[in-house]
C-alpha cells in the first residue's frame, strides 16, 4: 500500500468516524485488505475490505460511487439503498450497491453480537476511497 493510499484511507476513516460518531453509538472498523488496478481497464480499480460493527453499530447514509458487493461473514447486518426495502442478511448473505445508489442503512442488526462483512468495490480511481457521507440524507433519516 502506498503512502498516498494510506493517507487517503486514514483521512476518509477520520472523516467518516467524525460523522458516524454524531449519528451512532459506535463506529465501523474498516480493514483495507487489497487494492489493485484492473488490467485492461485504464482508470479502474478494485478494492477489498472488511467492515466490523460492534453490537448496535451503524454508519450514516453515504455514497461509494462504485459497484459494491457485500458478503456477510459473521453476525447479522441490515442494509438498504434509497428507493428499496431494507434487508437483513446473515452469514453467506449478499448485497449489491450501484455507483448511483445512496446507502441509507448499514448497521448491525443485533444489539448483543458483533457483525463482520467483506466488501469488494469496483470503481474509477479518480473517485477516491468512497463512502462519502451524504449530509442531506442523514438529516432526512433523522427527521420525524
Give names to the regions the model predicted.
Residues 86, 100-127:
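Ligand-binding loop in jelly-roll beta-barrel domains
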Residues 43-48, 67, 84, 100, ...:
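Extracytoplasmic
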Residues 34-66, 109:
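N-terminal targeting signals for Sec/Tat export/insertion, comprising classic cleavable signal peptides
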Residues 2-47, 80, 95-96, 114, ...:
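A short, N-terminal "cap"/entry segment at the start of jelly-roll beta-barrel domains
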Residues 66-84, 91-93:
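Glycine- and acidic-residue-biased ligand/ion/polar-headgroup-sensing regions
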Residues 50, 57, 73-76, 81, ...:
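Sec/Tat-exported extracytoplasmic proteins
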Residues 58-60, 78, 95-108:
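Histidine-centered metal-chelating micro-motifs
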Residues 38, 42, 53, 83-100:
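Short acidic-glycine-tyrosine-enriched beta hairpin
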Amino acid at each position: 500500500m502506498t503512502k498516498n493510499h494510506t493517507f487517503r484511507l486514514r483521512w476518509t476513516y477520520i472523516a467518516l468516524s467524525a460523522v458516524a460518531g454524531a449519528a451512532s453509538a459506535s463506529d465501523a472498523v474498516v480493514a483495507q485488505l487489497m487494492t489493485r488496478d484492473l488490467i485492461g481497464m485504464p482508470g479502474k480499480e478494485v478494492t477489498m475490505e472488511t467492515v466490523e460493527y460492534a453490537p448496535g453499530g451503524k454508519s450514516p447514509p453515504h455514497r461509494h460511487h462504485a459497484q459494491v458487493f457485500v458478503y456477510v461473514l459473521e453476525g447479522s447486518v441490515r442494509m438498504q439503498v434509497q428507493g428499496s426495502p431494507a434487508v437483513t442478511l446473515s452469514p453467506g448473505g449478499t448485497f449489491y450497491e450501484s455507483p448511483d445508489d445512496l446507502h441509507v442503512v448499514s448497521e448491525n442488526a443485533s444489539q448483543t453480537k458483533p457483525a463482520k462483512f467483506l466488501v469488494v468495490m469496483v470503481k474509477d480511481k479518480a473517485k477516491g476511497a468512497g463512502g462519502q457521507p451524504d449530509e442531506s440524507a442523514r438529516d432526512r433519516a433523522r427527521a420525524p
